[in-house]
Amino acid sequence: MIDTSIPLVDLHRHLDGNVRVETIWDLGHQHNIALPADTLEGLAPFVQIQGKESSLVAFLKKLDWMVAVLADLDAVKRVAYENVADAAISGLDYAELRFSPYYMAMNHKLPIEGVVEAVIDGVKAGLKDYEVKINLIGIMSRSFGQDACMQELEALLAHKQHLVAMDLAGDELGFPGALFNDHFKKVRDAGLAITAHAGEAAGAESMWQAIQELGATRIGHGVNAIHDPKLMEYLAANRIGIESCPTSNLHTSTVTSYQEHPLRTFMEAGVLIGLNTDDPGVSAIDIKHEYRTVKQEMGFSDAELAQLQRNGVEMAFISDSERKALYAAKA
């Protein structure tokens, strides 16, 4: 199912959406934070999706528990370290871990730049212990507004040498991308790549805006592109990468079933699209789950799965020499 001659990558993976249940339990008790359950087993349903069905509201409540226990910078560093470990344990050769320092800082009023530094330190520590290639993507959480996003961006750009890209995430309908054009001019001036969550809650126009005004060369989710034939043609012709997250889309009710997911529509249109986990801690999945699910639930052949694997490597925010090195390591 997984082609072992092709690097296995996960490019849309939220570091702050992948906190182990045991870590939430440990940090909650360490910092005297009231948890919603009295046992580790009882905690799991409050922080992870149980079964296939969910809603965006239920999903986000679980996600909030992942950052509710980040009471100090050591906790942030631990979570970053464990994200590297989890990426390696799940069999990934390369992962891009994205994080919103404002979101991670807000519950316990941590310094935003301190959170950025703690994430970088945790990842560096993880890379000493685990054999996996990792890059970081900074997130601006649009739901907190323009001013908060500018604070977040400045904290991230102070450490831009440790980032490969910036992302825009959060409430796509309430905070459209046009509110952040000035922010992304700073990102482009800093020389970072750009991805954006778009076409998930809003329509194709949100994706056009992200590409034409923000400068995005990759789009997170993008499921609503299929309603705009011109956009689909543009995506294919310009090799705009679509970071597809089928299980997450099901869990947030972006799609109602795997069979309804537009992954195959994108592939048949020649769009560059790859498989990703999104918030693997909340969804209780790993990357192999996504490949297995696409095969079993959506009828993809092994050849099509291999193409998805290759697409992921092509879409990665790495140099051609780094891409070659990933392939060479699989030979």
From Swiss-Prot:
Keywords, ordered alphabetically: Hydrolase, Metal-binding, Nucleotide metabolism, Zinc
Organism: Shewanella loihica (strain ATCC BAA-1088 / PV-4)
Stated family: Belongs to the metallo-dependent hydrolases superfamily. Adenosine and AMP deaminases family. Adenosine deaminase subfamily.
The record's free-text note on cofactor binding: Binds 1 zinc ion per subunit.
Gene Ontology terms, MF aspect: 2'-deoxyadenosine deaminase activity; adenosine deaminase activity; zinc ion binding
The keyword NAD is assigned to this record: no
UniProt protein name: Adenosine deaminase
Taxonomic superkingdom: Bacteria
